[in-house]
Amino acid sequence: MKLNDTIVALATPSGAGAIAIIRVSGPDALEIVAPLFKAKSKKDLAKQPTHTLHLGNVMDGERTIDEVLASVFRAPKSYTGEETVELSCHGSPYIQQEIIQLLIRKSCRSAEAGEFTLRAFLNAKMDLSQAEAVADLINSENAASHQMAMQQMRGGFSNEIQKLREELLNFASLIELELDFAEEDVEFANRDQFKDLVSKIQTVLKRLLDSFATGNVLKNGIPVAIVGEPNVGKSTLLNALLNEERAIVSEIAGTTRDTIEDEMSIGGVGFRFIDTAGIRETKDVVESIGIKKTFEKISQAQVVVYLVDSSQIAVNRERLQQVRIEIEKIKNKFPQKPLLIIANKTDRLADEEIHNLKTKLEEISSHAERAQFLLLSAKTNLGVEELKEKLLEYVNTGALRNSDTIVTNSRHYAALLKALEEINKVEEGLNADLSGDLLAIDIRQALHHFGEITGEITNDDLLGNIFANFCIGK
C-alpha cells in the first residue's frame, strides 16, 4: 500500500440512494478533481480555501456526468490530514462508478479498506484507539454502543491511558537518570512517591479491566436466553418483545426445535433474545438435540428468562413440582446467572388464581439464588413493559450514566492486562528494594503496552489487521 498517492472511494453505502459521496484524498486531490469540475461560479476549484462548498458539474471531456456539490478540505484541516475533496452526487450506482472510474483514469488509486482512517492515524489526526472507535461508531446499533464509541473517539480512553503513561514516564526518566550516575549512588526517583503512583496505576488499570465485561456485552448486545417447557409461549413472548413474528408459533408442544435469535434495543441498550427448545425429559432425538443446545445457550447468556404456563401450575401440583426441578437444574448448572421466572398466559386466570400463583412463585424464587418472578401475558402484552424494565435492572448501566471510560475492545483489554502484570512486577521490585536497572526493565515493558493501545508502539501487521475491518470509504 502506497501512502503518498491520491486515493478515491465511495464514502456512502453502495447501491442506489438519493445522494452518494465520493471521497478523494492525497497530495494531488485538488489538482486531479479541479480540471474535471466545472463550477457554476466559474471559479477554479484548485484555488478555493478549505471548508468551502461549490456547485458544479463533473465533466468527462465535453460530456456531463452529473451535477454535484464539491466540498474542499485543505491539509491539515481534513479528516485524513491531507488535501481532500468530497463530491456529493446523485445516488445512481451508474453515476457513482462513472465518476470513480474517471478519477482513477486521471491517476487516483482505489482506496483499500480503512485507508482514509489509516492516513488520519498516520497523520496524527487521531490515535489508534480513536481510529478503532470510528469502526465501532459505524457499527453501533443502539444508544449504549453509540455512546461508548463516541466517548472513545473523542479521546476519553486515550487521554486516561496517556495520562498514566506520562506519569510513569516521568518516573522512568528519573530511574534511567540514576543509572547514569550509578557510581555516585544517587537516588533521583523518590521511592515512596513512586509506590503511590504504582498503586494509583494499578487501581485505574483494574477499573478499566473490570469494565470490559460490561463493555463487551453492551457493545455486542446482552444475550438473554428464553427457556422453559415446550408450548408455554416462548415464541409468542419473543414476538411480543420484537413486535414482529420471527419464531414459529404453534399449539403443538415442542415446535421450537432449535434456537432462534433476534435483537432489539431497550432503553438504549441492545439485547439479543434467544428463544430455545424446552428442557423437559424426552426420547425424541431431534428435540433432545434442541435441549442440549438450550443449555449451551444458557451458558452464553447474561440473563436467563424461564417461562412457565401459569394456567397449568396454578391448578396442577405435579406440573408445579416439575417447574421446581427444571429451575433447580438451571441454577445448579449456572448458580450466578440472574434468573427471571415468568408466569405466562395470566389472561386465562381468575383473580384468586393469580393471588395463589404469586404465593407459589414467591416460594420458588426465594429458594433460587439471584431469582425473581413476574406475571405476564405475552398474548395481550400485559407485563411486557415490566419485563423490559427488569432486564435493564440486570445491566450495569451506571458506568454509562456517569460517562466513565468503558473498555470494549479485546485488543485494548489484552494490552491493559499485560501492562498490569508489568506494573505488579514494578510494585514487587519496589517492595524488595530492587535497584533502578532492574525496575527499569519492567517499567519499559509497561510503557510499551500503554503505547500499543494508542499506537505509539505498533507494526504493519497490527495496522493491517485493524484497518482491514473498516469499510472501503472510511
UniProtKB/Swiss-Prot annotation:
An annotated GO cellular component? cytosol
* Binding residues for Mg(2+): S235, T256
Which residues of the sequence carry a binding annotation for GTP? Answer: 231-236, 250-256, 275-278
Paste the cofactor note: Binds 1 potassium ion per subunit.
Question: What molecular functions are annotated in GO for this chain?
Answer: ATP hydrolysis activity; GTP binding; GTPase activity; metal ion binding
Q: Which Pfam families match?
A: MMR_HSR1, MnmE_helical, TrmE_N
Q: Which PROSITE patterns match?
A: G_TRME
> What does the sequence similarity comment in the record state about its family?
Belongs to the TRAFAC class TrmE-Era-EngA-EngB-Septin-like GTPase superfamily. TrmE GTPase family.
**Protein name listed in UniProt:** tRNA modification GTPase MnmE
Q: Which organism is it from?
A: Christiangramia forsetii (strain DSM 17595 / CGMCC 1.15422 / KT0803) (Gramella forsetii)
